[in-house]
From Swiss-Prot:
Signal peptide: none annotated. SMART domains: CBS, MgtE_N. It comes from Thermus thermophilus (strain ATCC 27634 / DSM 579 / HB8). This is Magnesium transporter MgtE. CDD domains: CBS_pair_Mg_transporter. The channel activity is regulated via the N-terminal cytoplasmic region, which acts as a Mg(2+) sensor to regulate the gating of the ion-conducting pore in response to the intracellular magnesium concentration. Under high-intracellular magnesium conditions, binding of magnesium to the N-terminal cytoplasmic domain stabilizes the closed conformation of the channel. Under low-intracellular magnesium conditions, the channel is in equilibrium between the open and closed states. The gene is mgtE. Its main location: membrane. One of its GO terms (biological process) is magnesium ion transport. Changing P321A: Abolishes Mg(2+)-transport activity.
Length: 450
């Protein structure tokens, strides 16, 4: 947003200048206002939503968090509520009402009463679907025609239907029972002879999803096919809605956030850091940290078991951090590559043997390369007795950690656990435990032979 416009908005709010504020709000783009939203005081946000042109107010509201949506829908005056609800697209309206329903079921019913009967029925139909499925993402505001219509008839129909449709770039063809039969683009219509029938120019090979298709699969299909719109059908193949690219972008952001949380063993996928308190953050992180520290306690037992070796050659302790850190980093690299390959379907569970053999070679090459560097450091430190110990240990640690990182995602997927949730933290912990065991075992074996 232009700095001048942002300053004007803040000044108008501070001074309570309603006329100046209306002028700024007429000019401002909803996305620019959203970028400034967190900087506005609570009472100023309320004023902005009250005075914004209704289309812009609906756009801003649709991009707020569910908690904020519920808050404003419960506090705005009835006349303003009605205006905003009428402007929201059906899918955004359903999402906003669901946010209120979770907070206050009684008020949710009052909001529904503000809707006309047709809109209320459509919103209730959308509310039956899970939020993370295609049915929860779709909007029923699509354009569908019959295959027996001519191009001229379709164009006349589009002129009437376009104002209420989410998009008219793609027109879907259905039979008399509403079952999806084909698709054609607006371009197809424009270049076709007006007397041509839809059945002659439509594409009968339609890529679609069902109402219960997971949102991540919906996003993947749209990305793979470069679609801006994807039709949604019910269990009988009847067209019930469309998913548009703007909804998929929100899904991709949510899925990316969820995956990043999982990689760090934070198992609250919808966590918003700026809105979470200390207790919520503690609950999101503590469970896996407890599990991992209990696993990591094995390392103290290993150290106690090799106490005599460490006492005999105290310099062994100097290289524990770099050995374990290198093993953990190697395992995490390997796990990240495999998790991503599984997520993008570059690999599936049947590929584990091929991956195992490939990563054996990769692990050996990495181990030899890194061992060469660390052995040089050991020599420089003046510990020639430890050269074979550190060199052999690092090769084995890296080799083993690389295999663990590559195979663990396959094992977790086989067990029905999301690999992204525990792979990296678990790989790091297992690498520490096994790395320490390898290092001290090699030390005992080689030093006793000297």
């Amino acid at each position: 947003m232009e700095e001048k416009l942002a300053v004007s908005l803040q000044e108008a709010l501070q001074e309570g200048d309603t006329r100046a504020l209306r002028e700024v709000l007429e000019e401002i783009h909803p996305q620019d206002l959203l970028a400034l939203w967190d900087e506005l005081k609570g009472e100023h946000r309320y004023v902005v939503l009250t005075l914004l042109p209704k289309a812009k107010a609906a756009e801003v509201l649709s991009h707020l968090s569910p908690e904020e949506q519920a808050e404003y829908l419960k506090t705005l005056p009835p006349w303003r509520l009605r205006e905003i609800l009428e402007e929201l697209s059906l899918d955004d309206l359903a999402d906003a009402l669901q946010a209120v329903r979770k907070e206050d079921p009684a008020y949710f019913q009052r909001l529904k009463d503000l809707l006309d009967p047709r809109t209320r029925a459509e919103v209730e139909a959308l509310a039956r679907y899970e939020e993370d499925e295609a049915g929860g993402l779709m909007t029923p505001e699509y354009v569908a025609v019959r295959e027996g219509m001519t191009v001229e008839e379709v164009l006349r129909f589009l002129r009437r239907a376009a104002p209420d449709a989410e998009t008219i770039y793609y027109i879907y063809v259905v039979d008399e029972k509403g079952r999806l039969k084909g698709v054609l683009s607006l371009r197809d219509l424009i270049v076709a002879d007006p007397r041509t029938r839809v059945a002659e120019i439509m594409n009968p090979k339609v890529v679609y999803v069902r109402t219960d298709t997971d949102q991540e699969e919906v996003a993947r299909l749209m990305a793979d096919y470069d679609f801006t719109v994807l039709p949604v059908v019910d269990e009988e193949g009847r067209l019930v809605g469309i998913v548009t690219v703007d909804d998929v972008l929100d899904v991709l952001e949510a899925e990316a956030t969820e995956d990043i949380h999982k990689l760090g063993a934070v198992d609250v996928p919808d966590l918003v850091y700026s809105e979470a308190g200390p207790v919520a953050l503690w609950l999101a992180r503590v469970r896996w940290l407890v599990i991992l520290i209990l696993t990591g306690m094995v390392t103290s037992s290993i150290l106690q078991g090799f106490e005599s070796v460490l006492e005999a050659v105290t310099a062994l302790a100097f290289y524990v951090p770099v050995l374990l850190g290198t093993g953990g980093n190697t395992g995490n690299q390997s796990a990240t590559l495999i998790i991503r390959a599984l997520a993008t379907r570059d690999l599936d569970l049947r590929d584990w043997r091929r991956v195992f053999l490939k990563e054996m070679g990769v692990g050996l090459l990495l181990g030899l390369t890194l061992s060469f560097l660390l052995v040089g450091k050991v020599y420089w430190d003046g510990h020639p007795l430890l050269l074979p110990v550190v060199g052999v240990s690092l090769v084995l640690i890296v080799f083993f950690a690389n295999l663990v990182g590559a195979m663990l995602p396959f094992l977790l997927r086989r067990l029905g656990v999301d690999p992204a949730l525990v792979s990296n933290p678990l790989v790091a912990t297992l690498s520490d435990v096994t790395g320490l065991l390898i290092y001290l075992s090699v030390a005992r074996l080689l030093l006793e032979a000297v």
